A protein has these predicted regions:
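Non-membrane alpha-helical segments in proteins
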Residues: 35-49, 61-65, 95-107
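Repeat-solenoid scaffold signature
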Residues: 201-218
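Alpha-helical solenoid scaffolds that mediate protein-protein interactions
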Residues: 46, 59-69, 73, 104, ...
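Low-complexity, Ser/Thr/Pro/Gly-enriched N-terminal "stalk/linker" regions
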Residues: 1-21
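Internal amphipathic alpha-helical repeat/solenoid segments
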Residues: 14-32, 75-89, 138-145
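Active-site lining segments of carbohydrate-active enzymes
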Residues: 82-199, 212
Length: 218
């Protein structure tokens, strides 16, 4: 965070987002996108560990920037010509963003301003929780998939609900749906030897998110 404090958070632009549709280049947009997530993670962790006022202030600025983005999904994962609600696309990174913000909301209750906490609840609910809960299962292609997308998206949504939703029937219904998707479909993608055909990197990515969700339920 000390290094990033001296840097300016890069801005996402419509021009960069459009590049994937125009020429197939997704890397320039993603470089900026993930740099912004680096700011979020760095100042979030610094705030959680050290609780310094300057880190909290910087984090609140970064959260405001993230919440002002037009779409949390990557440009390569949306279908603007087919889906009028493409800005609400829930992909790997959108679900991760929601989970990260929800976790910061829960762990920094006493440090974050009421305005920032309200912003987090509003945007994460609008972009992640409400669309998922309103859609009849399996509403997304990854919800009944046997690859890492299932565990990453489902796991992050489940953890987001744990941190943001009040205990009750609505929350339990969502968590039951998540557990069913992971246990019924994702785990079917593994062979008897515990391996998957996606490769080691994807195995770790999906399994890690499943384990994090399991731990968040404890």
């Amino acid at each position: 965070s000390d290094q990033l404090r001296e840097e300016k958070m890069p801005a996402l632009s419509r021009t960069l987002f459009d590049e994937y549709e125009i020429n197939g280049n997704r890397l320039r947009y993603e470089a900026v996108y993930f740099k912004r997530r680096e700011f979020l993670s760095a100042f979030g962790l610094a705030s959680i560990i050290w609780h310094k006022k300057e880190d909290i202030q910087k984090l609140e600025y970064v959260i405001g920037e993230i919440c002002s983005e037009g779409c949390w999904a990557l440009s390569a994962h949306v279908k603007r010509l087919e889906d009028p609600n493409w800005r609400m696309t829930i992909d790997l990174t959108a679900s991760e963003t929601g989970h990260t913000l929800a976790q910061m909301y829960a762990l920094l209750q006493d440090e974050l301003s009421e305005e920032t906490k309200k912003l987090i609840k509003t945007e994460v609910s609008r972009r992640i929780l409400i669309p998922f809960m309103k859609a009849k299962a399996p509403a997304y292609w990854w919800e009944d998939a046997t690859n890492n997308w299932n565990a990453v998206c489902c796991g992050n949504i489940g953890s987001t609900a744990i941190f943001l939703l009040e205990d009750g029937a609505e929350k339990e219904k969502l968590l039951s749906r998540i557990r069913y998707a992971i246990e019924t479909y994702y785990l079917e993608g593994f062979g008897a030897d515990g391996a998957c055909t996606e490769g080691l990197g994807y195995w770790g990515y999906g399994f890690m998110n499943m384990v994090v969700f399991a731990m968040d339920q404890r």
